[in-house]
Amino acid sequence: SYCNHFSKGEEYVKNVLNELKVSYIRQYCIKTDERYYNIDFYLPDYGLAIEYNGEQHYKFSQYFHKTEENFIKQRQRDSEVRDLLYAKGIKLHIISYRTSFEKVKIDLEKLLK
């Protein structure tokens, strides 16, 4: 199923976190009264969430969204996740699909030292 599909970017982040020997929860679930949100990585020791955002988080994709309305919902969800994490005192580090893997690694090393 799609829920068990991880992008190359997410796999790379996982490998870097493992390399840095950082404990994390993958696909961490945050629940509100209305719905559930899955966060790509939650690092409890750091009070940090990491989201690897693919292209579909930034622009409409027929493949991912099917309709413009679904793209708008995607953007709303991203905003709700930011607000929810902020309210819980969890920092959010967003990695864009446009970021080179080399830079992803450097950024994570800085963030987690």
Residue ranges and their predicted role:
Residues 1-113:
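Nucleic-acid endo/exonuclease domains
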